[in-house]
Amino acid sequence: MEENIFINASFIPSENLVALIKSLKKNQAVFLEDEPIAFFTTEGQEVDFDTYEVTEYTHDDVLRIEHTWDIFAKNHEAIQRDFHLVTQGRTSQPIPETAVAFNKENIFIEEGAKLPLCSLNATEGPIYIGKDAEIMEGSAIRGPFALCESATVKMNAKIYTGCTIGPHSKVGGELNNSVLMGYSNKGHDGFLGNAVIGEWCNLGADTNNSNLKNNYAEVRLWDYETQGFARTGLQFCGLMMGDHSKCGINTMFNTGTVVGVSANIFGSGFPRNFIPSFSWGGSGGMTTYKTNKAFEVAKIVMARRGIEFTEADAAILEHVFEETAQWRRG
């Protein structure tokens, strides 16, 4: 490491921020108030910001992910920014004649996308349809919305504002202000709202999450940093699910539920609102989901998509298993 620019990953890049970071020279840093955004350092240099030439970031376009719930809460704005960056200077594929579209100039369709007999309403925000993505007939979508490459919206889906569907993922039923990462499936009826779903997850048919408490109170969410339930400041907050987790048919998740990595949830009733990584069970209790069994499933799931489960993948998940052991009971 002779020279490096370190970047605070919680800041979502904007054109102004990227330009400023690219202009950094040795011993220079960019701060937002007391928080470092980026700094240029060398191998022999200690990270002592008193010795740095500090530039204060003064633009009003800061978008920062400070908590897990920010991923969905700030997704409306993130989609609008990305839409501008991805589409500027480019021409969309034509909107099919069989599709009903509102505010067409706010809709961008990549090559190979299929969207017959669907409704696209970009009045409240842009709609982006990725390469080789498909929106099946009868689906109704409101922007801001992003459907990434080779992702699928199943027939008669209802998708409200602020949703992003990651590459190669499949969604159906009803979604509102939710983010699914790549290669995850919510392919059937059921409601997912104010939620974040990691990669390689699968939600069984008629899985539902609550995103509003019956008493309309502020939602508290498990926080790994404090090892307790944090105040979100939100009235609407649904499900946070880590990579490789699965749930069976008719699973019900309570308001503000956090599911860790590689958990397997099934059965009737509401499971607890914090399910540690590598948990196996449901409302009746949890046992430990052994890594050898979890890895067998991951290999099968990933192979179906033509992707190898590598030694690096296994090492990462083993590390997560060890780090989260303190929260598992069985």
What role is predicted for each listed range?
Residues 3, 117, 262:
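Conserved beta-strand and immediately adjacent loop positions that scaffold enzyme active sites
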Residues 2-3, 25-26, 135, 180, ...:
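Short glycine/proline-enriched coil/turn segments at helix->beta-strand junctions
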Residues 1-105, 112, 271, 277-330:
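Terminal amphipathic alpha-helical/low-complexity segments used for targeting or macromolecular assembly
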Residues 90-198, 214, 240, 258:
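Extended beta-solenoid/beta-helix repeat architectures
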Residues 20-21, 77-80, 86-88, 122, ...:
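Surface-exposed beta-strand edges and their flanking turn/coil or helix-capping segments
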Residues 155-156, 168-329:
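Glycine-rich hexapeptide-repeat left-handed beta-helix
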